Amino acid sequence: MASPSNSSTGLVSEFLLICFPNYQSWQRWLSLPFSLLFLLAMGANATLLITIWLDASLHEPMYYLLSLLSLLDIVLCLTVIPKVLAIFWFDLRSISFSACFLQMFIMNSFLTMESCTFMVMAYDRYVAICHPLRYPSIITDQFVSRAAIFVVARNALFSLPVPILSARLRYCDENIIKNCICTNLSVSKLSCDDITFNQLYQFVAGWTLLGSDLILIILSYSFILNAVLRIKAEGAMAKALSTCGSHFILILFFSTVLLVLVITNLARKRIPLDIPILLNILHHLIPPALNPVVYGVRTKEIKQGIQKLLRKL
């Protein structure tokens, strides 16, 4: 399908997003659970941010990291899900060239920053459980500030080139994206130019960043598990295993889905098209909806903070 001219990039000035090409009649039904998860994610993360901001007793490094995670989740949800729901409910499939690449930039940036934040939070739990006496001297406000700078700097170094490389390609005639989201490879495959370098860069950068984060997370939780198994009090051991186990499972889901998406995007002809589309959407809904529960609401201090907030209302 041709589109109006865009002098800076070729002929295409807008794209059409085709969600679930093989199951378009199901879109209204799919929108119901997606809408509920979106509302849950936004409400839970906003509540967590407000609670930590208003409660001075929660102004601690661990909760600053949790605030950063909630902020990343909110931005990711708002970047992707409203457009998906607009397609489902109102058939608003078109997206401008600039809006598509803006979505791609924010999505790539915040997903890699969230992966890095999970890694820093795993280290925080490692220090808290394996070296509790040294925790106040290691995990300080200065540590959180440096960690935040590292998260942003690493993202700028490795993730920023992804949308830039795609935006520099020429898009001549085809403008139909078989996805609900402007992912790098979904868009770049429409280009008239050779995209081998784009594919190679995303594969190498994705596996380097996400793979290294996942390895460090697994190492941190391995040390944590070893320390927890040495706890003699059965109640304390069970509580620690439950808490850290839920953290690790959620992180594993986040990282594994991202790595699977990198692979499926490079092997589209051998994998049903609707699978990566569904994984992309769920990846922007399930972790944001569960993070506040797993990391926040299950924490005694956060529960007390939310209760204080509700009493004020």
Give the ranges of each region predicted by the language model.
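Transmembrane helical core of 7TM receptor-like proteins
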Residues: M1-L313
